[in-house]
């Protein structure tokens, strides 16, 4: 992996975001996702690399492109593994709600955990709390620790939690401690990363979301120096989702074992989910969000707002890009 790859990866998420944004608010979540997938795949194909999708749009027989195991890039150059979500928050995009973005994580070959399409209990917190809060603790204990780490009273803390029935008890406990809840309907990657930056108004992410997105969040938090832990959830009664109606707890354990995951209750740290020597996170807003704006279409240009975090050069780049149209006559600042 090299410096040139950072710019290339930025352009990958920008193009995916633009493609999805054209369908924002139209109620067409599947079409928005498909547009982002196609745009991301097309731009990836132009990169000089031996790329491979390790987390993507599903198995080979489930997705036409960006499927797990698909080779991307020119076939020459450095080996790069990708975890991608071309339109994270498809419902958010379809309904023109905040928080949808095109997102990916990249690392050296073998550097990203090949997460199953399961759920994951997650804990994200700022760099000041890294290694101090712990997913094994109760929410109450972690809020006390976080309060000390950030020198804030508990009633000054805001915790992001997915608005799901499974989190009823968690939300109750957090509020009884005096902390505030910021519920989100979808898309916990941006919420997790926002915890790593001061000034976003959010201090912690707790609760259960999708495991593949957990790997992307972990990559970003590792590069940022923030705290992230994840634990796979294999019990459908805990996840409380109809998507697992055909699976039993025993069946899910069998699936994990078949994937080579025998320590099914393992707590994964950020540097285990994103273990490569080099790690890059890139996200570009489709709709406005906690970290950056969504795509803006203007008469003579299209504007994107993005974030790239890289261990290659220890940088966080917030990037506003103007994509000029042919024959553009006037570009506003």
UniProtKB/Swiss-Prot annotation:
Mn(2+) 2 binds at residues 85, 88, 213. The keyword Manganese applies. Keywords: Calvin cycle, Carbohydrate metabolism, Hydrolase, Manganese, Metal-binding. Substrate binds at residues 88-90, 119, 164-166, 186-188. InterPro entries: FBPase_class-2/SBPase. The keyword Metal-binding applies. Its cofactor is Mn(2+). One of its GO terms (cellular component) is cytosol. Mn(2+) 1 binds at residues 33, 57. Homotetramer. Belongs to the FBPase class 2 family. NCBIfam families: glpX. PANTHER family: FRUCTOSE-1,6-BISPHOSPHATASE 1 CLASS 2-RELATED, FRUCTOSE-1,6-BISPHOSPHATASE CLASS 2. Catalyzes the hydrolysis of fructose 1,6-bisphosphate (Fru 1,6-P2) and sedoheptulose 1,7-bisphosphate (Sed 1,7-P2) to fructose 6-phosphate and sedoheptulose 7-phosphate, respectively. This is D-fructose 1,6-bisphosphatase class 2/sedoheptulose 1,7-bisphosphatase.
